């Protein structure tokens, strides 16, 4: 089959080269964006007087037919034509002859593919943002149902201080909100039209690039043709955002996996989202959460792969950049499933509030003892030392903090009074954290209302 660039060559392309260099097996994912761009390019060529009205009409008509054939799975992709762009153009030439041969006027595959990818990424960013919004809504709804429950917070995976369970879920809602803000910021940089930059230096024809941008829904036009065709920073930035989102989902998954163990027994996952063992009949494995955690490494790998591909390329376009698509497509497929999976898990999560509360007393209240002494006029560092001495005493005696008598408290400081027992409750300890952003119930209820308004609940 004759190649679109075959005029300079005297030999046919080796079969190995065709197989090794083809990208249509994966870049056909961009087919609809490529056709959308083709149609806008046709209209721009007509506006510039390069195509007649009739030629433009014929091209657009056939492009729309090809789009339907692709939708229906009837379009025949040929790897010997290398990529999605040449497959569609070759079919136009097959149907329209010389009119089809005019389509690629004032365009290179270099600015064409960058435009396709930006169109694709704009659409996909919006989809990821919507999935994140659904996950955040689920977290807010979960917070509403757990606002009266208390649990231990952890630092170094050691019990720290009592918090309301809702505070935990709202923390992840804040994290995912920042993820969405980063994606929206990335979208702003993606929203820039490369088409009209040609291979590297621009084009010789009087194209109205701002008209093309308007047709394709781009807010801005690239200001340098080399930059427009040489960079894949917009994909790398997006993959970096995805890696952060994956990291956050992985950390949440890790907590839920631990909480689901018999040793913690804080939550129970629904049967429909777990699997069993081929040998151990008792097993109920949290596979969805484990794969969310596992696929995070894959998403990191895709980011590192593209960073490494781009790190030493001479200016401007190089064929190495063909390797940007598979990491992008793979990351999107897996990240979207990870978000959907986490939303499903949280939507049907059973929180075991009694077990959480049982784990929230004793030494988790010792910081409140130190703060109690501070309120009685004891310097904090002294109060901290006294509270630490109480811990050592209780460990030696094999007692819990709640079992101490007033006489025992007074052995450590005369500042202790009967009211010390008022703070020996996980709920009261949590509710003393009334600072803005703290874990007090009144503050959590306020934040829930703010979150519901922001999420449209």
UniProtKB/Swiss-Prot annotation:
PROSITE patterns, A to Z: FUMARATE_LYASES
GO biological process entries: arginine biosynthetic process via ornithine; L-arginine biosynthetic process
Keywords: Amino-acid biosynthesis, Arginine biosynthesis, Cytoplasm, Lyase
Classification via Pfam families: ASL_C2, Lyase_1
GO cellular component terms, semicolon-separated: cytosol
Pathway stated in the Swiss-Prot or TrEMBL entry: Amino-acid biosynthesis; L-arginine biosynthesis; L-arginine from L-ornithine and carbamoyl phosphate: step 3/3
UniProt subcellular location: Cytoplasm
Reaction catalyzed: 2-(N(omega)-L-arginino)succinate = fumarate + L-arginine
Family annotation (InterPro entries): Arg_succ_lyase_C, Argininosuccinate_lyase, Fumarase/histidase_N, Fumarate_lyase_CS, Fumarate_lyase_fam, Fumarate_lyase_N, L-Aspartase-like
EC number(s) per entry: 4.3.2.1
GO molecular-function terms, A-Z: argininosuccinate lyase activity
Top-level taxon: Bacteria
Stated family: Belongs to the lyase 1 family. Argininosuccinate lyase subfamily.
Protein name in the entry: Argininosuccinate lyase
Species per Swiss-Prot/TrEMBL record: Aquifex aeolicus (strain VF5)
């Amino acid at each position: 089959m004759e190649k679109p660039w075959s005029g300079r060559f005297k030999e046919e392309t080796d079969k190995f080269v065709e197989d090794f260099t083809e990208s249509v097996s994966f870049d056909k994912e961009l087919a609809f964006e490529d056709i959308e761009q083709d149609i806008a390019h046709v209209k721009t060529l007509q506006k510039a007087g390069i195509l007649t009205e009739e030629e433009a009409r014929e091209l657009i008509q056939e492009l729309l037919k090809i789009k339907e054939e692709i939708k229906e799975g009837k379009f025949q992709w040929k790897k010997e034509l290398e990529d999605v762009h040449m497959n569609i153009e070759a079919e136009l030439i097959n149907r329209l002859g010389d009119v089809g041969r005019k389509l690629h006027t004032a365009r290179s595959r270099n600015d064409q593919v960058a435009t396709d990818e930006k169109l694709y990424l704009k659409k996909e960013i919006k989809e990821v943002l919507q999935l994140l919004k659904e996950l955040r809504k689920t977290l807010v709804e979960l917070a509403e149902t757990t606002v009266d429950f208390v649990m231990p917070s952890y630092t170094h995976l050691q019990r720290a201080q009592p918090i309301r369970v809702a505070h935990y879920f709202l923390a992840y809602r804040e994290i995912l909100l920042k993820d969405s803000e980063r994606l929206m910021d990335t979208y702003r940089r993606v929203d820039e039209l490369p088409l009209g930059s040609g291979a590297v230096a621009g084009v010789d024809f009087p194209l109205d690039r701002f008209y093309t941008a308007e047709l394709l829904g781009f807010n801005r036009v690239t200001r340098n043709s080399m930059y427009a065709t040489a960079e894949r920073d917009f994909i790398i930035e997006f993959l970096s955002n995805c890696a952060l989102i994956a990291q956050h989902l992985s950390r949440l998954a890790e907590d839920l996996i631990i909480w689901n163990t018999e040793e913690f027994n804080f939550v129970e996952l629904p049967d429909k989202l777990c699997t069993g063992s081929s040998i151990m009949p008792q097993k109920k494995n949290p596979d969805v959460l484990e794969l969310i955690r596992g696929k995070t490494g894959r998403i990191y790998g895709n980011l590192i792969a593209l960073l490494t591909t781009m790190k030493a390329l001479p200016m401007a376009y190089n064929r190495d950049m063909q390797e940007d698509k598979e990491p992008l497509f793979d990351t999107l497929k897996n990240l979207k499933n990870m978000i959907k999976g986490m939303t499903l898990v949280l939507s049907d999560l059973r929180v075991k509030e009694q077990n959480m509360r049982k784990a929230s007393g004793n030494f988790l209240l010792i910081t409140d003892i130190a703060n109690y002494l501070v309120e009685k006029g004891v310097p904090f560092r002294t109060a901290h030392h006294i509270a630490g001495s109480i811990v050592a005493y209780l460990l030696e005696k094999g007692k819990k903090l709640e079992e101490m008598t007033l006489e025992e408290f007074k052995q450590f400081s005369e500042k202790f009074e009967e009211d010390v027992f008022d703070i020996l409750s996980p709920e009261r300890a949590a509710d003393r954290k009334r600072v803005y952003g703290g874990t007090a119930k009144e503050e959590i209820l306020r934040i829930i209302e703010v979150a519901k308004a922001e999420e449209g609940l």
